[in-house]
């Protein structure tokens, strides 16, 4: 995934920032609890293609983002 593209992409619903999950090939919006797929290195930023995060996924991502960097 191109780093420059990641810097300018925002959530199409709330216009908020996204978290890139390389292993899952998804861009996640914590505000809306949505995960947008990345297919063949192309982000699919459509509401209809996004999946809702489970409560467990959401909590894990929030905790990971809040953890201090050592």
Swiss-Prot record:
SUPFAM superfamilies in alphabetical order: Trm112p-like (SSF158997)
TM region(s), chain numbering: none
Stated family: Belongs to the UPF0434 family.
Gene Ontology CC annotations of this record: cytosol
PANTHER family hit by this protein: PROTEIN PREY, MITOCHONDRIAL, ZGC:162634
Name used for this protein in its record: UPF0434 protein MCA0634
Signal peptide: none
Organism: Methylococcus capsulatus (strain ATCC 33009 / NCIMB 11132 / Bath)
Pfam families: Trm112p
Domain of life of the native organism: Bacteria
Lineage: Bacteria, Pseudomonadati, Pseudomonadota, Gammaproteobacteria, Methylococcales
